[in-house]
Amino acid sequence: LADAEVEYKDHISNTIYTSFEIKKTDKDFLKKSHVVIWTTTPWTIPANRALAYNGKIKYSIVQMGKDTQHFKNKNIIIASELIKRVSEECNFKDFKIIKEFNGNNFKNTVCSHPFKNLGYDYDVPMLEGDFVTLAQGTGIVHTAPSHGPDDFNLCLKHGLKASNTMNDAGIYSDEIPFFSGTHIFKADSQIIQKLSECKSLLGNGKLQHSFPHSWRSKAPLVYRATSQWFISMEKKNLRKKALKAIDDTVFYPEKGRDRIRSMIETRPDWCISRQRIWGVPLPLFVSKKTKEPLKDPEIIENIARIYEKEGSDGWFTDDPQK
């Protein structure tokens, strides 16, 4: 959906505090510690590929006491400013801070996925991200490149690919060990249970917050990284031509010129594909086996001729052989 087609309504989400055990690090004082994250989307844990931190934030190693189910005498790591809030939300009081350090010490640190014994036995690197703040959570962000723009861009920068987490129906794909075949909105309870069984769950609860919904269907929305079709703004000088066209156009009111000009000056490549059942579809046939599009100019020209004569409804109603 386009941004203009998204509206925000109150929604109740499950929340979790869960840990990723450090497996490799350059800093001796970080060894054998557990990095704690907070998320309102437990269903994205199987899509996790990294943890994001802020090099300017101060973090603390907290030695836990005996009033938690899975973390007795273990060391956890959270942002220093958020210790009080996390301890209250996770209901533990028996702890002591044994060391405070700057976030840049996380460089070259690698963690294990909490589901490492369920088929998720890959490295989870810690990466610096300037989007990490102290507004909520633990100061360390669970990063799933398939399900968020910040996540995607940070992982892309470090060569981590987005996994094919789910299909078009919102069901975990075969690439997701243990949970494949489950609808993502029905998976939270399973994820929470397994995190507890893996002794990685520090706490969980619920949160009412503003959440994106489709303005047409009113259904809740999720971010999902998929292959799309783009028109480059740089090739064939499209951006330059568009800016010149704006300058050559008379605007009423005149202030509209600056608004659209600033939009074109900074916009990324133009995504022209959509996944929806209204509007004009792109005339593309895609192989069911390889998922590759049929790149045949003659066929595309034939479809264009049909559109000109009959409109686009035929794409949905006519025989594909036509």
Regions found by a protein language model. Name each.
Residues 50, 57-63, 67-140, 149-153:
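Protease-associated
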Residues 1-46, 66-67, 108-110, 119, ...:
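Residue patterns forming the tRNA-binding/recognition surfaces of aminoacyl-tRNA synthetases
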Residues 9-10, 51-55:
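Phosphate-backbone binding and catalysis cores of DNA-processing enzymes
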